[in-house]
């Protein structure tokens, strides 16, 4: 059930940011923290979560040379920001926040 914005005066909000690029993620965390601090709310974070590393092994040759392989990896970086007492203005600021395209954001109450 979705609560109206008026019920967020004492809500706890968790923001989870994820990206393949650590530099974009740090830039986005700084933007989120700056907008939260403008509304004078207490915040914890950013909390660095473990980096998920996925390695893919691919044969270099399409037909022979099974011993010749190539490894590719994808690293996923995660951060969490907790807001303890959040107002409706803060929620609206977070919804209007402009983040880079490589960053995924989840806002949970």
From Swiss-Prot:
Q: Which Gene3D superfamilies does this entry report, sorted A to Z?
A: Ribosomal protein S10 domain
* GO term, biological process aspect, one: translation
The protein's matches in InterPro entries, at most eight in alphabetical order, are given as: Ribosomal_uS10, Ribosomal_uS10_dom, Ribosomal_uS10_dom_sf
Q: Would you tell me the Gene Ontology cellular component terms?
A: chloroplast; ribonucleoprotein complex; ribosome
Keyword terms: Chloroplast, Plastid, Ribonucleoprotein, Ribosomal protein
Cellular location(s): Plastid, Chloroplast
Q: Does the keyword Metal-binding apply?
A: no
The record's Pfam families line, in alphabetical order, gives: Ribosomal_S10
* Chief site of localization: plastid
Classification via HAMAP family: Ribosomal_uS10
Its biological purpose: Involved in the binding of tRNA to the ribosomes.
Description of how the protein assembles with itself and partners: Part of the 30S ribosomal subunit.
Family membership, please give it.
Belongs to the universal ribosomal protein uS10 family.
Q: Which named protein is this?
A: Small ribosomal subunit protein uS10c
Question: Which organism does this sequence originate in?
Answer: Cyanidium caldarium
């Amino acid at each position: 059930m979705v609560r109206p914005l008026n019920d967020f005066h004492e809500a706890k909000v968790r923001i989870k940011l994820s990206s393949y690029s650590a530099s974009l993620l740090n830039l986005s965390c700084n933007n989120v923290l700056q907008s939260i601090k403008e509304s004078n709310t207490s915040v914890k974070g950013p909390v660095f979560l473990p980096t998920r590393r996925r390695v893919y092994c691919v044969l270099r040759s399409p037909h022979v040379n099974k011993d010749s392989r190539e490894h590719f990896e994808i690293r996923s970086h995660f951060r969490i920001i907790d807001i303890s007492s959040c107002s409706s203005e803060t929620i609206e600021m977070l919804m209007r926040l402009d983040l880079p395209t490589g960053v995924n954001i989840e806002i949970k109450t």
